[in-house]
Amino acid sequence: MLTDPIADMLTRIRNATRVYKESTEVPASRFKEEILKILAREGFIKGYERVEVDGKPYLRIHLKYGPRRQGPDPRPEQVIKHIRRISRPGRRVYVGVKEIPRVRRGLGIAILSTPKGVLTDREARKLGVGGELICEVW
């Protein structure tokens, strides 16, 4: 039994980008879809789509990479360099609007679950709401 499906999704994304996969699949849920909408809007992934695998709903995540590097390592640059779960089932992390972290001084994003929906750190600050700190990405 999976105790933290969000951490599982983030781990699948992290592992797939490390081996330069084109896409990866995760079991579907509305909450995961909201997180993926933010990642796509902020440019961390190309997009996602709903698919059926053996009659079960899945989300196929299309990963994004930068241009090929020069030198001895010609692999493309990873767009997602770091993706980490912060609030977990065993240790929930809630922040008020004044405690929302700035990830990499604004180069990365924090994703929060708020009363106004799933938002980035910038959107939550703009709307003046805090919430549960789901993850950080840069």
UniProtKB/Swiss-Prot annotation:
Signal sequence interval, chain numbering: none
Name of protein: Small ribosomal subunit protein uS8
UniProt similarity note: Belongs to the universal ribosomal protein uS8 family.
Keyword rRNA-binding: yes
Organism annotation: Thermus aquaticus
Top-rank taxon: Bacteria
Described function: One of the primary rRNA binding proteins, it binds directly to 16S rRNA central domain where it helps coordinate assembly of the platform of the 30S subunit.
NCBIfam families: PRK00136.1
Protein encoded by which gene: rpsH
GO terms for cellular component: ribonucleoprotein complex; ribosome
Cystines in this chain: none
Keywords: Ribonucleoprotein, Ribosomal protein, RNA-binding, rRNA-binding
GO biological process, any: translation
